[in-house]
């Protein structure tokens, strides 16, 4: 019998969604240190909710609503992976990716976009993204991308 604690909202720069403790038949397994952090840079709340539901409760999700917040949250929380929407207000995902790459070459960044042309994919990869998932995002495509980076 598994129970998962519901997420809590917090954070000034964006919002953090935590799923941190699992109970299994009398044994409590505290997974706070093992849970991977995923920064989701997405300006549309319904898209974030969809991603949250597709990803499930095995991760701590950080929500940035634009590229500027994504950079600040990256610096503050050092996520294990970033899902980066390309078209966002204030600063787009490609520019945010380029700036984040000046801090880290290692963190995997997966571009999320409705633009599915090969030139869009090439530009995202050129700007520092490691992978590319087109919207609408399917559970299979997202799982495949996360598995690629062992997240």
Can you describe what each PLM-predicted range is?
Residues 1-28:
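C-terminal catalytic ATP-binding subdomain
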């Amino acid at each position: 019998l598994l129970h998962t604690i519901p997420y809590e909202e917090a954070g000034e720069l964006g919002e953090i969604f935590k799923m941190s403790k699992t109970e299994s038949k009398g044994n409590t397994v505290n997974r706070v240190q093992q849970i991977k952090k995923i920064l989701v840079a997405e300006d549309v709340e319904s898209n974030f909710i969809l991603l949250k539901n597709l990803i499930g409760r095995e991760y701590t999700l950080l929500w940035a609503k634009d590229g500027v917040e994504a950079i600040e949250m990256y610096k503050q929380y050092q996520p294990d992976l970033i899902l980066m929407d390309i078209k966002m207000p204030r600063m787009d995902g490609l520019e945010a990716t380029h700036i984040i790459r000046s801090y880290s070459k290692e963190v995997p960044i997966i571009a999320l976009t409705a633009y599915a042309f090969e030139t869009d994919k090439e530009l995202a990869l050129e700007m520092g993204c490691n992978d590319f998932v087109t919207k609408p995002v399917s559970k299979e495509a997202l799982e495949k991308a996360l598995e690629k980076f062992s997240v």
